[in-house]
Amino acid sequence: MWTVTDQEILNRVTAVVRDQLDDDEVSLTMDTVAKAVDGWDSLAHVRIMVAIEESFGIEFRTSDISGLDNVGDLVRLIEASR
């Protein structure tokens, strides 16, 4: 069975965030927090989460999203949701 690595998920998440923020310079690490990324405000957060759900073919629960502290938490949530 083929598994997606954390780095592959991070790369896809980065692509989604770049697209949603219309900023090809965005660079994410597992430790990145939303407030450290220009333009990643509450409205952008909703758009990013919806785009990630569509990109990965998954659906998040609100309680899952509200518990995210950084991009690494998001990557692990995506991995667990697949």
Predicted regions and their residues:
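C-terminal alpha-helix/helix-terminus motif
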Residues: 56, 75-82
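Phosphopantetheine carrier-protein modules
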Residues: 20-39, 55-69
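Two-component histidine kinase catalytic core, primarily the HATPase_c
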Residues: 44
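Short active-site alpha-helical segment characteristic of glycosyltransferases
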Residues: 48
